[in-house]
């Protein structure tokens, strides 16, 4: 919930017109990924609070004792404990929607060829699940829990590698502008970030380390794998955002006067 709070705060700070944020919630547009995202965020937050309250007495007894001193708080915690399983199950569809909607939002932005891929939404979802599993491995206290989520993350990393390959193939088999967009990570300005920080450091090395950990060959570097997965998750999003914003359907340098472009750059504050 703390990470969700940080994310929602940064989203709010990024808004150009912060006073009008309420307008997201005056209507719901079925065909708008932005509308879906706004409503998903507002629904996920209270459900996640209920999920925390369902285990607060077992996980945070000191905090639970403070909540129990207030009658409504005690009643709410009792209710959450009674319906813990139902609350946990209700979180799943909203969590999946939260993980996938960013990629869907970007892929719907047809003006940017690098984003215009049907694989992007699933890639963001699987990457988010992988980084979540890695975070659990880092903070879990029980060995059995660490081992379980290491195995889950191993499967997710393999799925992520397959999705990355599909995205690259999709761009390579697309229009000329999609191929040009692909060049940004195939020898272009984002090649290093994509292939070194994301693919190698964020996927391949953790994959190898987790295989060695599960097989019992080497456990000395086991805790390095989830850290690298988190680095890779960030690198993926940074590269996708930067490369996508630079990709375009119009080749300005060849279709417009170079003198006019130079003058526009000089006048740009």
How should each PLM-predicted stretch be described?
Residues 135, 235-237, 243:
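Membrane-water interface signatures at transmembrane helix termini and the short loops
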Residues 227-228, 238:
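C-terminal accessory segment of soluble enzyme catalytic cores
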Residues 15-35, 102-121, 170-191, 239-269:
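Membrane-interface interhelical loops and short amphipathic "cap" helices
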Residues 2-19, 37-62:
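Transmembrane-helix bundle segments that line or gate the permeation/cavity pathway
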Residues 23-27, 34-40, 123-136:
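The feature captures the catalytic groove of carbohydrate-active enzymes
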Residues 1-4, 92-94:
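Alpha-helical transmembrane segments
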Residues 47-218, 223-225, 231-233:
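Long, contiguous internal "core" modules enriched in hydrophobic/ aromatic residues
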């Amino acid at each position: 919930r703390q990470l969700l709070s940080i994310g929602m705060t940064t989203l709010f700070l990024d808004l150009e017109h912060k006073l009008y944020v309420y307008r997201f919630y005056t209507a719901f547009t079925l065909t708008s990924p932005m509308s879906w995202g706004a409503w998903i965020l507002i629904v996920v937050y209270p459900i996640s609070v209920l999920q925390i309250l369902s285990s607060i007495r077992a996980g945070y007894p000191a905090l639970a004792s403070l909540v129990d001193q207030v009658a409504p708080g005690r009643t709410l915690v009792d209710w959450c404990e009674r319906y813990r399983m139902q609350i946990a199950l209700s979180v799943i569809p909203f969590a999946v929607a939260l993980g996938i909607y960013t990629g869907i939002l970007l892929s719907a932005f047809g003006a940017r060829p690098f984003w215009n891929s049907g694989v992007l939404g699933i890639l963001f979802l699987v990457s988010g699940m992988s980084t979540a599993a890695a975070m659990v491995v880092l903070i879990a206290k029980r060995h059995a829990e660490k081992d379980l989520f290491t195995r889950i993350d191993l499967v997710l990393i393999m799925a992520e590698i397959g999705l990355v390959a599909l995205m690259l193939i999709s761009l390579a088999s697309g229009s000329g502008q999609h191929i040009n967009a692909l060049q940004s990570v195939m020898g272009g300005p984002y090649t290093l970030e994509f292939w070194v920080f994301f693919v190698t450091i964020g996927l391949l090395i953790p994959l190898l380390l987790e295989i060695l950990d599960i097989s019992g060959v080497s456990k000395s570097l086991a805790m390095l794998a989830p850290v690298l997965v988190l680095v890779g998750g960030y690198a993926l999003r940074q590269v996708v955002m930067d490369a996508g914003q630079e990709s375009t359907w119009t080749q300005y340098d060849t279709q417009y006067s170079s003198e006019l472009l130079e003058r526009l750059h000089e006048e740009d504050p």
